[in-house]
């Protein structure tokens, strides 16, 4: 109910009492009722103003300066993004000068061997036990399609300390040619990238290799198109 409605109701009540009450006794009662109504209206108006302008209301929980509420999901994401600088990591690229074979190098720009990871015999050597992200990409390029089927393979293998036999961790095969290029037709160039990646539990001393079956088709036109790496998680 608004303040104007309350005042109007009080006035109507006073008028009704004035008509029915008589003598000094009636006047006294009207005076008491008027005073009571005045204080009631004044109190209601004051309470309305205090609530409207937020002077009083539900108590709000206060926190020290600089303290923020973070959801459990946000805390998990924040902690997982803080990777330790002493974790093993490696990123090597293909040697562009070794046509006809895939040889990995860590001496080019944007390559990395950190925290005890080694590159030996064209293999990455794992320095500590743990979970690792293993990834590799190769890019094949050709001109036209031969009469025989052309299959391109890319395999990431592991030679474990506990089981010294080569085991394929990731493997992919692609065929860029659907049919032979007709005799006399223009031999159009084709490109076929293969990317692979996965997370594996590795042991200290494990050796990892990334190999292909037809290195003559590798595209060495630009550095960074063919690479191999691991990241400790």
UniProtKB/Swiss-Prot annotation:
GO cellular component terms given for this protein: cell surface; extracellular space; plasma membrane
Top-level taxon: Eukaryota
Pfam families with a match to the protein in the record: TNF (PF00229)
Residues bearing the modification Phosphoserine: 2
Topology relative to the membrane: Single-pass type II membrane protein
Membrane-spanning segments: 36-56
Cytoplasmic topological domain residue ranges: 1-35
Residue spans, topological domain Extracellular: 57-233
UniProt keyword Phosphoprotein, yes or no: yes
Residues lipid-modified (N6-myristoyl lysine): 19
Record-annotated disulphide pairs: 145-177
Single GO MF annotation: tumor necrosis factor receptor binding
InterPro entries assigned to the protein according to its UniProt record, in alphabetical order: TNF, TNF_alpha, TNF_CS, TNF_dom, Tumour_necrosis_fac-like_dom
Entry's Gene Ontology BP terms: extrinsic apoptotic signaling pathway via death domain receptors; immune response; necroptotic signaling pathway; positive regulation of canonical NF-kappaB signal transduction; positive regulation of extrinsic apoptotic signaling pathway; positive regulation of NF-kappaB transcription factor activity; positive regulation of transcription by RNA polymerase II; regulation of biological quality
Residues covered by the THD domain: 88-233
Subcellular location: Cell membrane
Assembly description: Homotrimer. Interacts with SPPL2B.
Family: Belongs to the tumor necrosis factor family.
Name the record gives this protein: Tumor necrosis factor
Source organism: Tursiops truncatus (Atlantic bottle-nosed dolphin)
Origin organism lineage: Eukaryota, Metazoa, Chordata, Craniata, Vertebrata
């Amino acid at each position: 109910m608004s303040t104007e409605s309350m005042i109007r109701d009080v006035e109507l009540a006073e008028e009704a009492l004035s008509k029915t009450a008589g003598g000094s006794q009636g006047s006294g009662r009207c005076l008491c009722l008027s005073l009571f109504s005045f204080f009631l209206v004044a109190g209601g108006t004051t309470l309305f103003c205090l609530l409207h302008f937020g002077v009083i209301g539900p108590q709000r929980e206060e926190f020290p300066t600089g303290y923020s509420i973070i959801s459990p999901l946000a805390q998990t994401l924040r902690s997982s993004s803080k990777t330790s600088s002493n974790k093993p990591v490696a990123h090597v690229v293909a040697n562009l000068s070794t046509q006809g074979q895939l040889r990995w190098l860590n001496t080019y720009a944007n390559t990395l061997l950190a925290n005890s990871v080694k590159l030996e015999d064209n293999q990455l050597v794992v320095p500590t036990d743990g979970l690792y992200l293993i990834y590799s990409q190769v890019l094949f390029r050709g001109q036209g399609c031969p009469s025989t089927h052309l299959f391109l393979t890319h395999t990431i293998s592991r030679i474990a300390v506990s089981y010294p036999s080569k085991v394929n961790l990731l493997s992919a095969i692609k065929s860029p040619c659907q049919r032979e290029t007709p005799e006399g037709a223009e031999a159009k160039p084709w490109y076929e990238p293969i990317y692979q990646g996965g997370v594996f539990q590795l042991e200290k001393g494990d050796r990892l290799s990334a190999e292909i079956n037809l290195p003559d088709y590798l595209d060495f036109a630009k550095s960074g198109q063919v690479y191999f790496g691991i990241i400790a998680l």
